[in-house]
Amino acid sequence: MLSTLAFVTSAALLGGMLYFALGFAPLVFTRLPAETAARFIRAVFPVYYAMGAGTALLATLLLLPTGRWAAIALAAAVAGGFLLARFALMPAVNAARDRGMAGDDAANRRFAKLHGGSVALNGAQALALVGLLVLLAKG
């Protein structure tokens, strides 16, 4: 029963992540003026990271009593990724973006690297969730 709940929780998280990355964020930047879109996304990301961390942590806690250590490790890694993104990566991305918008070319390059790292982390988390779902589906 706990593994099933963890499966559903993880599947919902993966679906939300894919929707956010492939649907919501691109839509914001194609439908809103650039400055408005940037401010809006900056306000949304802390919520996205908190919800992601909380959901992955819930999956981790649901799995703990099962002793399925590989699944527990994957769920915990996803939660950790969200916390890393929220408390380390996001402030650095925002600071680099702000300096870049003020004309600092080096900051623009730093922003591009940090943003790329953020996208890569999100992709790695999605792959970890796919792996977790496969493990849980196997029973």
Language-model segments: which ranges?
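Polytopic transmembrane helical bundles with strong interfacial aromatic enrichment
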Residues: 1-139
